[in-house]
Amino acid sequence: MGNYRKLWWTLIGVLGVTFCLLGWFGREVYREAPPIPAQVVSADGAVLFTEKDILDGQTAWQSVGGMQLGSIWGHGAYQAPDWSADWLHRELTTWLDLAAQDEFGQAYAEISEEQQAVLRHRLKNEYRQNQVRDGVLVLSARRQMAVQQTAAYYDTLFGSDPAMQQTRKNFAMKEDTLPDAGRREQMTRFFFWTSWVAATERPGQDATYTNNWPHEPLIDNQPTGENLMWSVISVILLVAGIGFLVWAWAFLRKQDEEEPVAPARDPLTTIPLTPSQRSLGKYLFLVVALFGFQVFLGGATAHYTVEGQDFYGFPLSRWFPYTLLRTWHLQSALFWIATGFLAAGLFLAPIINGGKDPKLQKVG
């Protein structure tokens, strides 16, 4: 063990530093988390919804699959859109259309480029400005109307409106994804908050709470210099780290004085199987069964990209919606991998123990 003392201390040092960094960044994540307004009110002071409504909306969104169906802030599945980015763009374009009708009597697409530029400037000023004061977020009358119209789209999308059936198929959403109208309303409030976070600048900074994500030219949501710098640094550190490991393996490790000779016979075949090793057959059968289950689920999940609700004409989403199959597909992989590692450990234990089963090994 003495020969490896330096390596042990190196490992302990690396783990100590990395866990300190992990703890510090974990604290920063909570400290820098975007605020949830205690109240969202209209320009005349009427309460539109509260923090509890936003959190209840998050629960409603999670109940239909959460990150398995679409995404929030880019962290989920992209069979359906990123709801925060989609909501933001729809709300912005709705605001522009409302403003164009109010001020010029035409749709935004029909007014001149100069008029469009004026409206986009006002749009950016209204959306990027942090308007939370003492936990209260105030919406202008125009923005309130844009939010209501955007929410109406999501209410029909997650319901059973026949006009949205093709869109639901494109997104691999079952009919009546969220049946309760009250829950759909709560969910739209959560979606609004996620888009508000993506559009609103942090106090004292010129970047939003999501560091200008998603890309949205209408309000100049573009990658910051900090984004680009750390992206480049991350790639450089990754390549440099891999290069250092290769160099260390080639030049720093101790070379064997003589090349080891491969045995004429596999050493494992010279050791008779113990009772516990023979009983591992059920584990291996379970691994194969779970692996096959995962493969078939993967095929069915992938097929949702072709037919958003059906499987060769069979209404699969009615019984096994996309979010459920995708969840089972991922979970079955975890189960067969974990079972395989467990079986390997149980098989190797008697070999390490000199060809004898550890006490009570077969019982386990």
Model-based region annotation:
Residues M1-F49:
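Post-cleavage N-terminal segment of exported redox proteins
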Residues M1-L7, D220-E226, T269-L280:
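Short, Lys/Arg-rich N-terminal segment immediately upstream of the first membrane anchor
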Residues Q255-L280, K356-L360:
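Membrane-interfacial, low-structure loops and terminal tails that flank and connect transmembrane helices
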Residues A33-P37, G299-P315:
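Interfacial/capping segments of alpha-helical transmembrane domains
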Residues V40-G45, D310-L324:
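Perimembrane loop-to-helix junctions flanking transmembrane segments
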Residues E51, Q62-G66, R265-P275, P315-P321:
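Short linear interaction motifs
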